[in-house]
């Protein structure tokens, strides 16, 4: 019997080499994919937080405007007028909350949400702003901002909740911002 020297790889050696090569490529790609997904989630969370903060600032603006428009007495802003214009946001009037469009000219009274759901915000891609203008398209994230105010004689708790469904169709944990505002003294 004569033996021949065989050169090359066996089938098993080739399969193991291909498997190792595939794993060395798949690992970094998986990490990069997770990083990209996390970046998109963080971006949406930032937008949600700033939309909530924008609503808080709008409530403050409307409170300040109502106090400045009504002459006060020695105790400051009149107790009956300090939340004037925000009636649809009071939980005693509209338990579902309201929507505030901070970009509307001559801001109308906030609109009460109906059926337990507020209107979806729209995005103006030209000016890079969110609003409730029906002429603007819906965003892929579909942000929904709900404003609720619980008030007493001299204090109000403003709660803003921003919900959204991301580009992949996953409902994310809502952003909730609470702030106490007070009647001017």
At which residue positions do the language-model features occur?
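N-terminal hydrophobic targeting signals that begin at the initiator methionine
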Residues: 1-2
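Aliphatic-rich helix starts adjacent to a transmembrane/signal segment
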Residues: 5, 9-53
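Low-complexity, Gly/Pro-rich coil/beta segments used as flexible assembly/activation regions
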Residues: 46, 50-185
